[in-house]
C-alpha cells in the first residue's frame, strides 16, 4: 500500500522497483544502476549516505501445524537442535540474526539450517510444509499471526532489532 499511496500523491514520478538483498542494493548504488535504495541490517559503506526509515524486529516463527515440539519460549542453547530456514547470505536479516547469535557465543555453523531462501514469502511458504522454524520480520508475518497460521517463538535473551535505511551515494541530492 505504501507504493500505491506514493504514486497517487506523486503521479509525475517515474518509479521502478527492484528487489534484492542489502548488499546487492549497495553494489547497485555504487555502480550507478539505481539512485535510491532501501536496506536492512548493519552495513555502513563510507561512500553511501544512510537515512533511518523505520525500526523493526526479527522473530522466530513456526507453523501452527508443525510437529516440532517447541514451547512459546526457548533458550539460545536449544537453537542447535531446531531445524531452521533462513534468509540467504548477503541479506540484512541473516546478518542481524548472526550478530544476535554471537552475543551468546553461537555461530550459524553450529545450527541445523535446512535451507537458505531468497525472501520472506518463500520462508513463510516453506514453513507451511515443513517442521522447522524461520527467522523473519514481525511486520512480514502480521497477517499470518492474526490468522493463526504462524506463531512466534521467543528466543530468551536474544533481541533481534534492526533498522531499515534509505541509502544513496554521498553528495547526491
Residue ranges and their predicted role:
Residues 48-85, 89, 169:
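Flexible hinge/capping segments at coil-to-helix
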Residues 1-46:
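Central regulatory/effector-binding core of bacterial HTH transcription factors
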Residues 83-105:
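Secondary-structure junction motif
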Amino acid at each position: 500500500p505504501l507504493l500505491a499511496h506514493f504514486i497517487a500523491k506523486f503521479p509525475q514520478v517515474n518509479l521502478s522497483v527492484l528487489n534484492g538483498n542489502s548488499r546487492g542494493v549497495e553494489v547497485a548504488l555504487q555502480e550507478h544502476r539505481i539512485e535510491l535504495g532501501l536496506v536492512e541490517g548493519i552495513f555502513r559503506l563510507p561512500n553511501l549516505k544512510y537515512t533511518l526509515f523505520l525500526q523493526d524486529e526479527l522473530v522466530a516463527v513456526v507453523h501452527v501445524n508443525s510437529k516440532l515440539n517447541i514451547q512459546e519460549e526457548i533458550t539460545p542453547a536449544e537453537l542447535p537442535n531446531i531445524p531452521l530456514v533462513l534468509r540467504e547470505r548477503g541479506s540484512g536479516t541473516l546478518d542481524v540474526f548472526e550478530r544476535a547469535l554471537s552475543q551468546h557465543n553461537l555461530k550459524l555453523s553450529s545450527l541445523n539450517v535446512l535451507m537458505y531462501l531468497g525472501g520472506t514469502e518463500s520462508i513463510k511458504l516453506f514453513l507451511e510444509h515443513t517442521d522447522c522454524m524461520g527467522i523473519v520480520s514481525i511486520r512480514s508475518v502480521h497477517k499470518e499471526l492474526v490468522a493463526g497460521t504462524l506463531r512466534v517463538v521467543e528466543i530468551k535473551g536474544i533481541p533481534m532489532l534492526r533498522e531499515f535505511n534509505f541509502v544513496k551515494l554521498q553528495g547526491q541530492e
